[in-house]
Amino acid sequence: YESWNRLGLPRAESILPGAQLIHATTWALPPTSLPLAVTVHDLAFLRAPEHFTPRGNTYFSRSLERVIAEASAIIVPSQATADDCIAAGIDAARLYVIPHGVRTRPVTDEQIKNFRTARGLTRDYVLWTGTREPRKNLLGLLRAFALLIEEHDDADGLDLVLVGPAGWGDDAVERNLLARLGDRVHVTGRLDDDELAAAYCGARAFCFPSIWEGFGLPVLEAMAYGAPVVTSAGTCMAEVCGEAGLLADPASPREIAGRLAKAIGPAHDELAEAGRERARTFTWDACAAAHTEVYHALIGGAV
């Protein structure tokens, strides 16, 4: 990647003789004279640069300039990201919206029980998954959870489980709130695929109040495993959920708490089934077929 970015070497066709096109699935664009497709997962760094490091913002900005100059086709996972690309100066004719898919794995009651035992979970729980970084809005989630257990009787026996690796952006307020919530919050770190599936299946609800994402795959995964979803209004996650999720202003912990109260209440089963049905419309087969159409168009010169 560094060689591509700094030296423009080696050229892709020297590594892949006989290739007819190149698809860059990250911001690392290989130099090439072949047709180039690029996946742009999101432009969150333009929407909220304060949620990224200065070095990261510089890298993303330079990469975006190269995408605009060099890509024949730009593949995005959501209409929200497509709209951001157009606002950033990308020609709409080069954009292709191809949503991600989801594939679940079988999970037994014993696996769920083992996960709960291993993590010391004796109560129902709200689940969050992701990398812990500012744009994920964990502080907003913690504030919402504190309101939920303080103000809603249904949440008396409820914990919060945070799954995923540490990212960047140490927040003293977040740390203090975690300390105040004590054993009601469980931070697991990264889980393997089987544990993660069990975590989704065992959750009473899933909350993902990110400020911005390119797609929000955890939301789709949660729906597929039957966890009612609370996520951010006005974002791509609302696009993924359709009518199957509960939407809240990510800047309003009280609104998030209210949606969570609904998700764990009498509407739980209906929301869970609606999420499963919605998730069935997102398949990797459809995703692959749509990519193949773009590739054929590039090779044929139609793009």
Task: Identify the residue ranges that each predicted region occupies.
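Carbohydrate transferase catalytic cores enriched for Leloir-type hexosyltransferases
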Residues: 1-303
